[in-house]
């Protein structure tokens, strides 16, 4: 009978568990020139869990270590303790790694306490588990088996090739019982210099329960540890929106002002995420709302950029400085939101209104040329925006921008602030000459101011800007007609006499003595302007309004002064003389002092 036929018969008898037939084939018929031929039958017998056949094969020369697949691994997978003992007694290698698995690792994965204990008793090295299997074992092994490993003197501080220790992987796997067990058995939380285990940060990044963090802090993990990016646990729990952990860390005195490699604090991350709760917690625990540098925006800038009004108000309430240096000035950031309420809030808290952005533009210029609603420009001007401030790049003024954008509303607004119509840009152009075509309405507004300025100040001829304006008008027939109309109307206004000394022209200049203008407020020719006045009507009306306001202030101040003991007995005409010497601000102070 050929060996192939005998081999098949041997495999068949092993599968049928026929020990006598196995003995008969091997002892009587099957002569082996190569004992390795019994390796396959041995593995088959182990797989069949037939310990008697396995013992017989081993006694007759089967070599455990010649099998293609280790019989010991198979026995462990089957959970056959006696088979494991038999194989080990016959020389099975208890450290042999097959398909990435050692016998001890397989026993642990199968959670077979008996086999685990036996392998350890026979000298299996438990430390190879932590060196070779990293975090693979931590979710597979119950706490009781870890206790066995500790009993057999496993090193709790051993490092694998990544320089990670068992406690690191226990934290990574969020295994509270194991973390507690390791710490109770003196696992070290000290991180050697140059290593990056960062236990608390690892706990936060892997969504550990708050109880784990509390345990780690109890055993001495520093709450302000920083990783390779110089971030702390606070940075990571803020980024993940974990408010309970954030509160815990802050209660344990975590520093909210540590900056990472990007120079960002936890507060930067909280505001960037629009996280009101985290922002509040950090500020209440001392986070600096005014940290700033050249790398990252201020927290207030970030809140404004996010259009988060709640955060803006919160930061301002806690003292955020609206004038901190940043990559993009706060006022420009607020303008970008196109939200009038945000702009108003930061202006109300002292934001610098006359500051250039990175392109060298002023806030007022931006508001005009980007076609924002006129209320934005009005607000900026009310808070002190300089209507004559030039851009750094081309030296255009807001009036240049308004005319280039053909914005009648902006031109009218700027003119009401007595803007300089003679300002020239880098190319030598005034607002009037900076564009080829201007509408009649805008041209009339500008030219009427030029004509009026000339009447007031003959030295204008010395200004380059005035010369440029006159040259522009002289080269444009339409402009010349407008100038002629302005000159004719001014002549008509001068001919409207209010008395032997003054004409209606005194109302053309708001800087004239208001005390004189007040006397003519009720004059019929002032109350009802002539129909011939159209171009300069707004100038006169503006002056009338300011004079009316001053008249009321003087009248009210005299009336309220009757309650002031020092001057209540002063004759009324003297009181008028006194009040006329005061400016409007002083008059308001008198009224307010009595009202209090």
Swiss-Prot record:
Record's keyword annotation contains Repeat: yes
Start-end of each ANK repeat: 5-34, 37-66, 68-96, 99-128, 130-158, 162-191, 195-225, 229-258, 262-291, 295-324, 326-355, 359-389, 394-423
UniProtKB keywords: ANK repeat, Repeat
InterPro entries per record: Ankyrin_rpt, Ankyrin_rpt-contain_sf, PRANC_domain
Record bears the keyword Repeat: yes
Domain of life: Viruses
Pfam families in UniProt: Ank_2 (PF12796), Ank_3 (PF13606), PRANC (PF09372)
Cross-referenced Gene3D superfamilies: Ankyrin repeat-containing domain
PANTHER family registered for this protein in UniProt: POTE ANKYRIN DOMAIN (PTHR24118), POTE ANKYRIN DOMAIN FAMILY MEMBER 3C-RELATED (PTHR24118:SF99)
Protein name per UniProt: Putative ankyrin repeat protein FPV024
């Amino acid at each position: 009978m050929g060996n192939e036929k005998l081999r098949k018969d041997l495999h068949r008898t092993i599968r049928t568990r026929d020990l006598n037939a196995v003995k008969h084939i091997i002892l009587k018929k099957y002569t082996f020139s190569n004992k390795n031929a019994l390796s396959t039958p041995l593995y088959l017998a182990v797989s069949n869990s037939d310990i008697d056949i396995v013992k017989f094969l081993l006694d007759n020369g089967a070599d455990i270590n010649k099998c293609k697949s280790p019989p010991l691994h198979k026995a462990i997978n089957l959970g056959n303790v006696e088979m494991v003992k038999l194989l080990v007694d016959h020389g099975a290698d208890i450290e042999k790694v097959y398909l990435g698995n050692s016998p001890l690792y397989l026993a642990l994965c199968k959670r077979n306490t008996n086999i685990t204990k036996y392998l350890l008793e026979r000298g299996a090295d438990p430390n190879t588990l932590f060196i070779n299997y990293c975090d693979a074992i931590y979710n597979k092994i119950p706490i009781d088996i870890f206790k066995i490993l500790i009993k057999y003197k496993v090193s709790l501080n051993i490092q694998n090739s990544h320089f990670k220790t068992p406690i690191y992987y226990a934290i990574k796997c969020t295994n509270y019982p194991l973390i507690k067990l390791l710490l109770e058995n003196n696992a070290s939380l000290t991180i050697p210099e140059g290593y990056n285990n960062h236990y608390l940060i690892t706990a936060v990044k892997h969504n550990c329960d708050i109880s784990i963090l509390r345990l780690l802090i109890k055993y001495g993990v520093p709450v302000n540890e920083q990783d390779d990016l110089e971030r702390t646990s606070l940075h990571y729990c803020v980024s993940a929106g974990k408010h309970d952990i954030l509160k815990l860390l802050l209660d344990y005195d975590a520093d909210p002002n540590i900056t990472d490699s990007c120079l960002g604090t936890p507060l930067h991350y909280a505001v960037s995420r629009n996280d009101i709760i985290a922002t509040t917690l950090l500020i209440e625990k001392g986070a600096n709302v005014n940290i700033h540098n050249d790398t990252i925006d201020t927290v207030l800038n970030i809140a404004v950029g996010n259009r988060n009004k709640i955060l803006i108000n919160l930061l301002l309430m806690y003292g955020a400085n609206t004038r901190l240096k940043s990559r993009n000035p706060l006022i420009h950031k607020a303008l970008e939101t196109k939200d009038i309420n945000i702009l108003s809030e930061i202006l109300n808290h002292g934001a610098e209104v006359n500051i250039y952005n990175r392109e060298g533009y002023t806030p007022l210029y931006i508001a005009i040329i980007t076609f924002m609603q006129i209320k934005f420009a009005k607000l900026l001007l009310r808070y002190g925006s300089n209507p004559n401030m030039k851009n750094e790049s081309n030296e255009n003024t807001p009036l240049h921008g308004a005319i280039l954008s053909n914005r009648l509303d902006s031109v009218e607004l700027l003119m009401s602030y007595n803007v300089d119509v003679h300002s020239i840009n880098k190319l030598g152009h005034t607002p009037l000459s900076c564009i080829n075509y201007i509408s009649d309405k805008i041209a009339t507004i500008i030219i009427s101011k030029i004509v009026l300025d000339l009447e007031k100040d003959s030295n204008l001829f010395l200004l380059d800007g005035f010369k440029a304006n006159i040259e522009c008008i002289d080269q444009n027939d339409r402009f010349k007609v407008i100038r002629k109309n302005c000159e004719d109307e001014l002549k008509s206004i001068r001919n409207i006499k209010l008395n032997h000394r003054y004409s209606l022209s005194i109302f053309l200049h708001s800087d004239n003595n208001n005390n004189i203008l007040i006397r003519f407020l009720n004059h019929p020719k002032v109350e009802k302007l002539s129909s011939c006045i159209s171009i300069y009507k707004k100038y006169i009306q503006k002056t009338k309004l300011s004079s009316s306001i001053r008249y009321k202030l003087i009248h009210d101040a005299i009336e309220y002064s009757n309650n002031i003991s020092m001057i209540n007995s002063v004759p009324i005409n003297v009181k008028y003389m006194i009040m006329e010497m005061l400016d409007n601000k002083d008059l308001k102070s008198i009224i307010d002092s009595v009202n209090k």
